[in-house]
Regions:
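Gly/Ser/Thr-rich loops at beta-strand to alpha-helix junctions
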Residues: 16, 48-56, 77-82, 107-110, ...
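Active-site cofactor/substrate anionic-group-binding motifs, chiefly glycine-
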Residues: 62-111
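Active-site histidine-anchored catalytic micro-motif
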Residues: 148-156, 161-213
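Internal helical hairpin/lid segments
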Residues: 248-355
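Cysteine-cluster motifs in flexible loop/terminal segments that predominantly coordinate metals
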Residues: 340-400
Length: 407
């Protein structure tokens, strides 16, 4: 295993010669794409939809290697960042009432919109005596819940990558009945479609190509992104997470733009198949059903969330068990990503996470960034998770700046 990992690192991470060659190819294709071909003179905007891709791009300073007319933009790629604050308020309330709340470590400090004088996160609730337990996986929560009979709830946060474990544990009847499931699962393709449409409807600088997430694609399959070139004429590449993977994806996208032949390519062939994992997909479909879902800072997106099907929901759905009324599309307060005003319970005042998540703004455009909002004391959701764009920029943005200055 170690030798295999070393081979991958040498080929896709430490291969400076290949990286230099790819940069030259990128410069070649970018240089051929002129404003007459695009219809405008602004940069060629390529969007990715994965927090790990943003980490790779920023950590390794890949933006500093690109021509000035190529811009990499982070889209909705952080599942923790898009959990609406009303679910955080609900979790805080349950923990303080004695219910055991199981959560991933990334979500422990996820802030609600309450004043700092009140419990704004599960970490605050834990300090006040709330029953909050950090787990690494749903399996850990299942195992711990079996050791007691108390009411418990697991915050089921995540994109498609977490669904295999969620689905199989329910399918195999491994989940104890005292453990309820608060489904905060969000699906990437609907969010991708929503974001691209939003850019076009608002007349924003258009997205010219997409780097599709590799981890998600191992589950759902590369073919799920076919709608991007077919319906939106967007060159799309499913990419891995090493620097070479990303550079290869950029080069392929620019070539497709230059050739005027938008298509779907799978660069991450060492793990991604066109149909993903059919067995896993069948289990997921048997356990969950798609629903309208709220995305923090964005709004409601059709069929972008999952809830337990009735045969599982009767015993495990946290909304039903605790008598919680979920937010409906008509009730959800839209945020500044749409109308210029923060929602009453979604995004904290002055925070621009809604725009950052959609790639409309950069973290450095936010007046709170690295001032009243830092990784140590996050004010907005994008600063909390290691996959959040603001968190990544806060930790590694200076590295990229140094690389650009010494280029």
């Amino acid at each position: 295993l170690q030798s295999g990992l070393r081979v991958i690192e040498d080929a896709f991470r430490n291969n400076r010669e290949l990286a230099s060659s790819l940069v030259r190819i990128i410069e070649k294709y970018a240089g051929k794409i002129d404003k007459e071909q695009l219809g405008y003179s602004a940069p060629i905007k390529i969007m990715h939809f994965c927090g790990t891709h943003e980490w790779t791009i920023t950590h390794y300073g890949l933006r500093s290697l690109l021509p000035q007319n190529v811009e990499l933009v982070a889209g909705p790629g952080c599942p923790v960042c898009v959990v609406p604050s009303n679910y955080i308020d609900l979790s805080i309330k349950l923990s303080l009432e004695g219910c055991v709340v199981y959560t991933y470590g990334d979500a422990l400090r996820l802030p609600s919109t309450k004043p700092k004088s009140q419990a704004r996160s599960l970490l605050d609730a834990k300090a006040l005596g709330g029953e909050v337990k950090v787990v690494y996986s749903f399996l850990d929560a299942v195992r711990d819940a079996k050791t007691h009979s108390r009411d418990s709830v697991f915050l089921g946060i995540g994109f498609e990558t977490v669904l295999p474990m969620y689905g199989f544990l329910f399918h195999k009847k491994e989940v104890p009945t005292n453990l309820k499931f608060l489904s905060l699962v969000r699906l990437t393709p609907p969010a991708m479609k929503y974001t691209i449409k939003l850019y076009r409807e608002r007349g924003l600088l258009p997205i010219m190509g997409v780097i599709a997430p590799g981890h998600v694609s191992t589950v759902i399959g590369g073919e799920e992104w076919r709608f991007l070139p077919m319906n939106f004429n967007l060159p799309t590449v499913v990419a891995g997470f090493e620097p070479i993977d990303v550079l290869m994806a950029i080069a392929s996208i620019l070539k497709m733009i230059n050739d005027k032949k938008p298509d779907l390519e799978i660069e991450y062939k060492r793990l991604v198949k066109t149909d993903g994992n059919p067995q896993v997909r069948r289990v997921i479909e048997e356990v969950f059903q798609p629903v309208y879902a709220a995305w923090r800072g964005i709004g409601m997106i059709a069929r972008s969330g999952l809830k337990l099907r009735p045969e599982f929901g009767q015993a495990y759905d946290a909304f039903e068990y605790f008598g919680i009324k979920d937010v409906s599309p008509s009730e959800y307060v839209m945020t500044h990503a749409h109308f210029g005003d923060a929602g009453s319970y979604d995004i904290p005042p002055n925070c621009r996470c809604g725009e950052v998540v959609l790639g409309i703004s950069k973290p450095t455009d936010c007046p709170l960034f690295m001032k009243s909002c830092t990784p140590e004391s996050p004010w907005g959701p994008c600063m909390v998770s290691s996959e959040g764009t603001c968190n990544v920029w806060a930790k590694y943005g200076q590295m990229e700046k140094i690389k650009m200055e010494t280029r």
